């Protein structure tokens, strides 16, 4: 163990050092233990290992004696006696000897306890076994043993494996594992071995060769169950439902540090921490009480930097406060990220509040907010990968220089601006408003998730010290909101820790009474960039104002004379001098009614240096004015110091000696007492004493610095439940504090919201594992030892004064009577919210977990002990219940009631619920049923124990109790009576925001305060999970996860252009290759559809060879639809439901060409020939290759696969049945046009019929009705329904009788886990376009509810790799249209662009013939000329006069886009055309964050191909739009093409001639 490296086992009772190895011999007690040697003491000497029989081991008075027999000469036992002390072995022997000796001591003690139990003695002995290794292909068990070699062992027992080494510097390992016997194959392969370890990671960790000696010993599970295990996830989105299954899977198993654990072989996590009793160990056993915490190495981090007046202040070293952020704080965090290898995505926002009033904020009373303020938020960095950290730092510096100028300059007119307003102090800043803005990112759990990042974490950086004035109503609203969200909040203070409790919020209630409280949902840290830790409080003084007013040392040298300080020769340091000075300053005065302390307590205080110093600094006296003879604590005036500015806060020291209430005293007498004690205050802002001869100089200095300030006597204000309330607390370094001299006496404080004792001895000890103190030091204590967080003295003496009052808000905040008094251990344990308490290991100081919050933030734990008492549960909650039964149709997918119950819990965890465990839950369950003992409450279920168990889940004010009886699941919802009037009556909060590319600040589109998580209809969600989708009345209310993808053209691989098919070399164009790629992706979607068990067993497997057809077109969409108008009018004709023909109707390859040609044209299921337009060419009476392949499979009994159909089709083509329209290709399966040769054409008549198979599934246009639904669109997914199929005719706007509904997309239920490796049915709904223009975007939309996100990500990755082979790119884009993004995410950057030329008004381009057909002709041309492709059409496009005869919808719903939306071919940015003709651009952060992987340590060149420079594209486009000459050239080019009739005005696209890579 390195020198000084200790683990603090108890935070608040002191910094008791604990050795890292608790099994060290120093822990052996001095009791005499003696044992005879046994055969198991086999020590490996220099040459061989011999069994000994004459050895005895004796431990007496910390002396270890080893008797060596004659047979042991020359062995490892030779040598002097080893002396034991509490510091360890003084004369160290080999590690093997130490460990074996320890085992001997422990086992000897067990033998002494029970000599008669020989079998138990044998079972607890270490056995030496020979090690082997096995591969994963034989067994996935980490450790396997030959049970016969371990007497008394059985499968499922817990065992310990130890390694011993004699080489210096090597470390022994202690690995725990569950006993698993050799299987038959392993026993045959490892005949001479007794234990085998899985090769690979564990083998590398143990670092042992084969046939090494290891020692195995059985252990008790209950004694070795660990408290907490930390799992780290990276580069994937792991939701809380999968975290729950992780916990279930790890139950009753063992893990070791660095172990990679997996869920369904695709979700990966790494074990990074195992804790037991405050100690981090290498390996441990997990039981039902072990907490599993998930931390993310690829999280979304949000930094909110508060821009206040203090940011421009200077530190002692001359550094500006803000520069600490960019010079030390962020670089240190980035280095931490680099060392860990994180892949975070970060956003940084400046948060400022401008006071527009003329008065100073000092005139505003404590706890009162500034009235005339405007809040501003500047998005500096928006979801940028940390690999760009150098650019991030440059941007931060530039924006900080400009922000004060931007905010304070107010434009009067175009050329005149004035400076107005000021930045207030951090105390008056907008903390709660900033927090509400950050929570807008996580209010909707069903939003479109980033599939590569887990967890959102907000970090607020401030120049203050943790003290804020807040609005009372806003505080209640904010805390209520945070109770239902999964976001964590950290506050980093750049100043030094103050002398009061932090974080501290001040507010005034409705009676204008001042309150102090500390929120539980805000974790605070103090940044210290020096190597010296903050072990003591150092007074500071602001000198900025002194210098600016000319009050320098030169001017005051004649007025100020400093009395020479007489240094005590006995003082060896400044700290000692200060201690001596304080001891002399505070003398103990004895009055006629002096208090007598308990002798034992006094001795305890004097026993330590810390307590002795505290004792000397405290004064116990009797106040002269107290007629009731009540003892008080009085601070004596230092002999050479007068009060400066105002009386200082006097720290409450001996709280149990404080006086009882003075409410019975007259107010005038009480005020007089405070006026008297005010002169005895100590000024804390200086270390120098002013001379007695110059006592008036102080007033001179003050009058110059603060001319309006008069030194007043301290005035106290009485409160209902306390004699004295602090009247002022400022967070600035020069501020002084003030408090009265009397305190309310309360010897035994109890939390008022707890009516019974909550802390037994064990729990009280556990509560010490957390601390409100920062990573450096808390300011609560003036003097403390370096290794102490809270001394025992301060815990005992401060306990009575800081008891919570009636104002305590449960798990939200705790009111503090006197912030200057440290809290006790009981109260401090409540300063971490119950929802997050499981994140922190017990007995581990919180300062050791601070960095992990910044580097690897934790997800909300799965369990919580927060639960109402039985009384509150009965009187404050109302009951609503519903029952759920599984739809019998789900049995076709092998679904059971257990799967339904599992999915119901899964979805609730996704929505933010937590499992409720603890005493209150048990009490409530017992109160419900007198016959139960509460043992049936659980959170881990499996197929054996899920019936008749109670599962409690809670979020905010909603509690669900779920119980499964037989085949029915009963859900009881308990809703707490919540007063929502406060939120409704709260004034609208409208801040100003400026995103990354904006030029001016604008009003925010949403109200952050009133944006909160909505309540869900759980009855509806549960019914959907059960498979009753048809009962849903409003599909829009269904909750699901969604993501949207577009397929864009990309660079085509060189070897793709030529291929050999049927022995013929085919050369394809770029367009044909990309169309073939789309067909392959659609084929992949179709083949992966979910099938019932009956369908899987269907022998007619060639049904799967029939692929859905996607109709490609060029030109105008409605022209394409109009060409099929005749077919639409006759779409009601009866057709055969089955896609297969009867045996009598089938053909074979032996059929002659005449018969085949007739069946093709005139058969019952013929291919209708249609006229097809492709670009500017029109082909008469043709069909496509895909149609013929499907037709051959359907109609030929000896054609079973698509490959067979292509080969046979080529034969027919060679025989002259048909030919390619341009004679460029042979017969190909895809979008290739073919015509029958004239000799086989029996009727030269064009039939307007789509060439597709005759089934309801393949019709292009169909009416939506309950009797005519596509099989592919049916909601056979048990977890989600297809929205379009649930829309009845009443829900959809009914068209006129002659109108026809046109469906432009298909919906398929995709099976994400065909091999059934998952623990649940993994499905999603895939919507894809069935009508597509190759010059536009092809769309794929996914919807799911209970699918594992990693499987969704894997599916997308497979599609992406497939697309790249054909010159395509799969790009994720927002589900919502672009104009709605600022309403959802206020941090998202965008830019509004106004054209330098308005083509509608400019005479050079104003042409009514163009605008009559296409108003945005020039805008579309500009976008497509710049590389943008059409994504979505505006809804008005589908509501034009040309669409009166039909209604267009999609399988995912009706198109509701307000504007036409385009996306750049790189996928990095998107654009919209507004009605005004302006452009709205925004970066596509979903695609950028998905592609930009890597950490800070990676080389920049390795990320060039993944990084999409959206900023460069957007800035270049804006430059073009705002440059008159550049824009004019593009518009002239567009006009010229129009004159030459080379464009289609209705739906123009120039992308076909646009070179992507020039």
From Swiss-Prot:
Which keywords does UniProt give here? Membrane, Vacuole
GO cellular component terms given for this protein: GATOR1 complex; vacuolar membrane
List the membrane topology term(s).
Peripheral membrane protein
Per the record, where are the segments of Polar residues compositional bias? Answer: 83-113, 717-727, 1281-1290
* Electron transport among keywords: no
Q: Where is this region: Disordered?
A: 9-31, 71-119, 717-752, 1258-1294
What molecular functions are annotated in GO for this chain?
GTPase activator activity
Location in the cell reads: Vacuole membrane
Instruction: Give the UniProt record's GO annotations in the biological process aspect.
Output: intracellular signal transduction; negative regulation of TORC1 signaling; positive regulation of autophagy
Q: Does the entry annotate any disulfide bonds, and if so which pairs?
A: none
Comp. bias regions, Low complexity: 728-741
Q: Where is the DEP domain?
A: 1163-1238
Instruction: Give the family, as the similarity comment puts it.
Output: Belongs to the IML1 family.
Name this protein carries in UniProt: Vacuolar membrane-associated protein IML1
């Amino acid at each position: 163990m390195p020198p000084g490296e200790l683990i603090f086992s108890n935070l608040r009772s002191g910094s008791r050092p604990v050795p890292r190895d608790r099994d060290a011999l120093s822990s052996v007690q001095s009791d005499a233990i003696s044992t005879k040697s046994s055969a198991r003491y086999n020590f490996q000497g220099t040459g061989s290992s011999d069994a000994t029989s004459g050895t005895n081991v004796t431990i007496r008075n910390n002396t270890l004696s080893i008797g060596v027999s004659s047979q042991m000469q020359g062995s490892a036992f030779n040598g002097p006696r080893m002396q034991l002390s509490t510091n360890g072995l003084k004369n160290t022997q080999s590690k093997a000897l130490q460990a074996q000796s320890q085992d001997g001591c422990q086992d000897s003690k067990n033998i002494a306890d029970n000599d008669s139990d020989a079998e138990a003695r044998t079972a607890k002995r270490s056995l030496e076994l020979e090690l082997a290794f096995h591969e994963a292909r034989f067994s996935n068990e980490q450790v396997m043993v030959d049970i016969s070699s371990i007497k008394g062992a059985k499968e499922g027992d817990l065992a310990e494996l130890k390694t011993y080494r004699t080489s210096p510097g090597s470390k022994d390992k202690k690995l725990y594992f569950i006993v698993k016997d050799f299987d038959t194959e392993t026993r045959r392969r490892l005949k001479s071995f007794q234990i085998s370890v899985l090769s690979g990671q564990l083998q590398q960790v143990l670092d042992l060769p084969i046939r090494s000696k290891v020692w195995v010993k059985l252990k008790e599970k209950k004694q070795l169950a660990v408290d907490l295990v930390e799992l780290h996830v990276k580069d994937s989105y792991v939701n809380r439902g999968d975290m729950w299954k992780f916990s279930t899977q790890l139950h009753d198993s063992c893990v070791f540090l660095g172990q990679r654990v997996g869920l369904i072989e695709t979700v990966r996590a790494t074990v990074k921490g195992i804790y037991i009793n405050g100690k981090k160990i290498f390996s441990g056993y997990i039981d039902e009480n072990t907490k599993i915490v998930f931390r993310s190495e690829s999280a979304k981090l949000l930094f909110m930097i508060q821009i206040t007046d203090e940011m421009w202040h200077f530190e002692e070293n001359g550094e500006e406060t803000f520069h600490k952020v960019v010079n030390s704080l962020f670089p240190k965090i980035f280095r931490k990220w680099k060392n860990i290898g994180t892949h975070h995505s970060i956003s940084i926002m400046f948060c400022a509040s401008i006071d527009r009033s003329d008065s100073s904020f000092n005139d505003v009373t404590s706890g009162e907010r500034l009235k005339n303020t405007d809040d501003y938020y500047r998005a500096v960095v928006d979801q940028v990968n940390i690999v760009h950290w150098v650019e991030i730092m440059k941007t931060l510096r530039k924006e900080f220089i400009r922000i004060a100028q931007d905010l304070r300059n107010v434009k009067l007119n175009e050329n005149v601006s004035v400076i107005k307003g000021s930045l207030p102090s951090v105390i008056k800043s907008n903390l709660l408003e900033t927090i509400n803005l950050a929570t807008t990112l996580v209010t909707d759990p069903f939003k479109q998730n980033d599939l590569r990042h887990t967890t959102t974490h907000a970090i607020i950086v401030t120049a203050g010290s943790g003290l804020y004035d807040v609005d009372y109503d806003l505080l209640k609203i904010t805390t209520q909101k945070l109770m239902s969200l999964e976001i964590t909040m950290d506050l980093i203070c750049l100043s030094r820790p103050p002398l009061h409790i932090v974080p501290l919020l001040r507010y005034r209630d409705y009676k204008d009474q001042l309150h102090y409280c500390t929120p539980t949902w805000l974790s605070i840290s103090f940044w210290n960039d020096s190597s010296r830790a903050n072990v003591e409080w150092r007074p500071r003084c602001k000198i900025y104002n002194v210098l600016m007013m000319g009050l320098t040392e030169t001017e005051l040298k004649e007025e100020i004379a400093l009395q020479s300080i007489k240094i005590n020769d006995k003082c060896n340091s400044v700290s000692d001098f200060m201690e001596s000075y304080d001891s002399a300053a505070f003398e103990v005065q004895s009055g006629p009614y002096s208090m007598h302390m308990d002798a034992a307590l006094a001795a305890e205080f004097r026993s330590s240096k810390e307590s002795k110093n505290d004792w000397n600094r405290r004064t116990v006296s009797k106040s002269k004015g107290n007629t009731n003879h009540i003892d008080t604590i009085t601070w004596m005036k230092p002999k050479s110091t007068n009060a400066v500015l105002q009386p200082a806060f006097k720290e409450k020291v001996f709280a149990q000696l404080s006086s009882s209430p003075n409410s019975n005293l007259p107010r005038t007498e009480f005020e007089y007492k405070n006026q008297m004690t005010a002169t005895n205050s100590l000024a804390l802002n200086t270390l120098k004493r002013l001379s007695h001869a110059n006592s008036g100089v102080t007033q001179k200095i003050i009058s110059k610095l603060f001319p309006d300030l008069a030194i007043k006597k301290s005035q106290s204000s009485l409160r209902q439940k306390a004699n004295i309330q602090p009247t002022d607390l400022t967070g600035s370094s020069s501020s002084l504090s003030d408090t009265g001299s009397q305190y309310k006496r309360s010897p035994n404080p109890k939390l008022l919201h707890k009516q019974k004792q909550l802390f037994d001895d064990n729990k009280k000890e556990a509560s010490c594992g957390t601390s409100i103190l920062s990573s450096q030091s808390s300011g609560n204590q003036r003097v403390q030892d370096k290794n102490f967080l809270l001394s025992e003295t301060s815990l005992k003496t401060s306990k009575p004064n800081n008891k919570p009052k009636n104002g305590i808000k449960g798990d939200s905040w705790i009111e503090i009577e006197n912030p200057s008094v440290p809290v006790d251990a009981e109260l401090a344990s409540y300063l971490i919210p119950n929802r997050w308490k499981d994140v922190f290991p017990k007995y581990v100081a919180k300062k050791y977990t601070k960095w992990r919050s910044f580097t690897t933030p934790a997800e909300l734990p799965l369990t919580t002990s927060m639960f109402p008492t039985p009384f509150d549960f009965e009187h404050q909650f109302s009951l609503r219940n519903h029952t759920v039964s599984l739809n019998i149709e789900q049995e076709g997918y092998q679904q059971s009631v257990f799967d339904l119950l599992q999915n119901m819990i899964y979805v609730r965890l996704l929505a933010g619920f937590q499992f409720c465990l603890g005493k209150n839950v048990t009490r409530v369950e017992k109160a419900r049923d007198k016959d139960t003992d509460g043992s049936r409450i659980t959170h881990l279920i499996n197929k054996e124990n899920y019936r008749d168990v109670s599962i409690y889940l809670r979020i905010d004010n909603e509690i669900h109790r779920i119980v499964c009886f037989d085949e029915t699941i009963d859900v009881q919802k308990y809703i707490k009576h919540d007063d929502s009037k406060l939120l409704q009556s709260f004034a609208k909060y409208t801040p100003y925001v400026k995103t990354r590319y904006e030029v001016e600040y604008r009003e925010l589109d949403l109200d952050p305060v009133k944006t909160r998580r909505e309540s869900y209809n759980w009855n509806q969600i549960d019914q959907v999970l059960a498979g009753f989708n048809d009962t849903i009345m409003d599909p829009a209310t269904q909750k699901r996860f969604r993501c949207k993808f577009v397929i864009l053209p990309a660079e085509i691989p060189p070897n793709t252009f030529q291929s050999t098919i049927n022995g013929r070399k085919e050369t394809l164009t770029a367009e044909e290759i990309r169309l073939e790629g789309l067909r392959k992706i659609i084929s992949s979607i179709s083949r992966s559809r979910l099938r019932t068990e009956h369908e899987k067993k269907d022998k007619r497997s060639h049904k799967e060879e029939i692929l859905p057809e996607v109709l490609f077109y060029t030109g105008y969409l409605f022209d394409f639809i109009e060409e099929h108008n005749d077919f639409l009018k006759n779409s009601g004709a009866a057709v055969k439901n089955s896609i297969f023909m009867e045996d009598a109707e089938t053909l074979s390859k032996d059929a002659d060409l005449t018969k085949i040609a007739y069946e093709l044209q005139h058969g019952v299921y013929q291919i209708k020939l249609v006229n097809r337009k492709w670009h500017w060419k029109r082909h008469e009476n043709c069909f496509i290759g895909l149609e013929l392949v499907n037709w051959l499979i359907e109609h030929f009994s000896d054609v079973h696969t698509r490959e067979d159909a292509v080969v046979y089709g080529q034969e027919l083509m060679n025989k002259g049945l048909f030919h390619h329209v341009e004679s460029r290709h042979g017969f190909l399966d895809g979008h290739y046009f073919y015509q029958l040769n004239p000799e086989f054409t029996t009727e030269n008549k064009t039939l307007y019929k789509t060439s597709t198979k005759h089934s309801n599934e393949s019709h292009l246009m169909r009416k939506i009705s309950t009797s005519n639904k596509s099989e592919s669109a049916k909601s056979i997914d048990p977890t989600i329904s297809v929205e379009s199929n649930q829309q009845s005719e009443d829900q959809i706007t009914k068209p006129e009788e002659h109108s026809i509904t046109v469906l432009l997309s298909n919906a398929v239920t995709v099976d994400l886990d065909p091999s059934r490796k998952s623990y649940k049915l993994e499905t999603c709904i895939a919507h894809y376009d069935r009508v597509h223009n190759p010059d536009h975007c092809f769309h794929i939309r996914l919807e799911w509810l209970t699918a594992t996100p990693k499987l969704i990500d894997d599916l997308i990755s497979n599609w992406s790799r497939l697309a790249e082979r054909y010159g395509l790119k799969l790009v994720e884009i927002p589900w919502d249209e672009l104009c709605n993004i600022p309403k959802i995410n206020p941090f998202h950057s965008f830019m509004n662009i106004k054209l330098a030329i308005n083509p509608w008004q400019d005479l050079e381009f104003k042409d009514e013939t163009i605008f009559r057909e296409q108003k945005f002709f020039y805008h579309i041309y500009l976008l497509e000329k710049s590389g943008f492709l059409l994504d979505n059409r505006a809804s008005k496009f589908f509501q034009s006069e040309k669409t009166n005869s039909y209604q267009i919808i999609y399988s995912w719903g009706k198109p509701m886009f307000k504007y036409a939306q385009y996306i750049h071919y790189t996928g990095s940015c998107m654009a919209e055309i507004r009605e005004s003709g302006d452009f709205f651009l925004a970066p596509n952060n979903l695609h950028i964050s998905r592609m930009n992987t890597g950490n800070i340590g990676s080389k920049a060149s390795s990320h060039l191909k993944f990084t999409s420079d959206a900023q460069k594209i957007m800035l270049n486009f804006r430059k073009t739009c705002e440059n008159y000459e550049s824009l004019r050239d593009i518009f002239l080019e567009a006009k010229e093409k129009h004159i030459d009739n080379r464009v289609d005005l209705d739906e123009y696209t120039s992308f076909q001639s646009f070179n992507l890579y020039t």
